[in-house]
Amino acid sequence: FEQGFDAAVELTALGIRPSLLDLTEDEDGIRLHLLFEGYREGVAADVQRVKQICVQTGGQDIGPGPTMEYWRDRRQSAVRYKAEALGRPRKVRWSRWGGRNFDYLHMALPVSKVLDYRKRCDLIMAGTGVKVAEYSLWSRPELFSMMLRPDTGDGVRFRANLAEVVEQVLTLAQDMGGIMEYCHGVGVKLNHLLARELGVSHDVIRDLKQTLDPVNIMNPGKLGL
């Protein structure tokens, strides 16, 4: 993962912007998916330089097959959502998550802190029954995601400790100069941590909210207000 991260940092620093950049470490191994689009000569130049970078950082070219398969299948979660939840009553949509044995966290951190953050998260989870089943970077090296699953088959222990583990890794991201959620938004789940993340900016948001909505009828309870 560290080698793929170094490659992502280098190509980003050079101004190379792949249409797809996905570095994933899971039970199947570690792969950096890259896909480019644009005019032929520009794409050829990007591909040539990126291959050099990946080899220099310890990578191996396994050909276009795995990335093309990934690209074809990337919509599956959206297809399932459309079939199972879209247009359904809220109770039906929410019941899909009942008793789920995973969580997906999406933090943004300074590039220089990402690898150290990963190591410190592993220490937080040690002995809790919670493990990282997938580490990933999407689009940019500072956008770091982790899928959390039970360390063993003990789902009860996992669920008992999950909230505390999530709280610790998210506040660690904040303490290291990052943010706790870059992908799906804060929602109500992370409401209680928003003031901690925004600092005095949260006071400004509160003042604006009170001025525009003095009786608090617009999305009450959101944004930690």
Please identify what each model-predicted range represents.
Residues 3-168, 172, 176, 187:
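C-terminal substrate-recognition/cap domain of FAD-linked oxidoreductases
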Residues 177-183:
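Basic polyanion-binding and macromolecular-assembly surfaces
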Residues 146, 169, 184, 208, ...:
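Hydrophobic, well-ordered secondary-structure elements that form the walls
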Residues 187-225:
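Activity-critical C-terminal alpha-helical subdomain
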